[in-house]
From Swiss-Prot:
Covalent S-S links between cysteines: none
Gene name of the encoded protein: rplR
Top-level taxonomic group: Bacteria
Subunit structure: Part of the 50S ribosomal subunit; part of the 5S rRNA/L5/L18/L25 subcomplex. Contacts the 5S and 23S rRNAs.
Similarity field: Belongs to the universal ribosomal protein uL18 family.
InterPro entries in alphabetical order: Ribosomal_uL18_bac-type, Ribosomal_uL18_bac/euk
Species this chain originates from: Burkholderia cenocepacia (strain HI2424)
A Gene Ontology cellular-component term: cytosolic large ribosomal subunit
Name of this chain's protein: Large ribosomal subunit protein uL18
Keywords carried by this UniProt record: Ribonucleoprotein, Ribosomal protein, RNA-binding, rRNA-binding
GO biological process: translation
Length: 121
């Protein structure tokens, strides 16, 4: 089993437990160059809010700082944006789905920024 399969196995177990809770899910996906966050409905079929480093406003803001989307500063910015968008959609509380990634570095920065911006999980 390679590391990608291991990550997906961990993600599957987390998603099963979150589905039992019947709450909105904040899912995070990261690549070497970008980070993505989406808030899914409790049934898991509809995306209620999303933010990523591919958005034009985010890219413009990151160009002023470091010019890249694959760092902790970018993850912090995405965490704030996803919290604002979720609150605008009427979502106050979510379950955090780290998609099998370790809670460290960019994933941790995104989660902490979302919490500071008022999202509860």
């Amino acid at each position: 089993m390679d590391k990608t399969q291991s990550r997906l196995r961990r993600a599957r177990q987390t998603r099963i437990k979150i589905a039992e809770l019947q709450v909105a899910r904040l899912a995070v996906h990261r690549t070497n160059t970008h980070i993505y966050a989406q808030v899914f409905s409790p049934c898991g079929t509809k995306v209620l809010a999303s933010a990523s480093t591919l958005e034009a406003e985010v890219r413009a803001e990151l160009a002023d700082k470091s010019g890249k989307g694959g760092n902790v500063n970018a993850a912090t910015l995405i965490g704030k944006r996803i919290a604002e968008k979720a609150k605008a959609a009427g979502i106050e509380s979510v379950a955090f789905d780290r998609s099998g990634f370790r809670y460290h570095g960019r994933v941790k920065a995104l989660a902490e920024a979302a919490r500071e911006a008022g999202l509860k999980f």
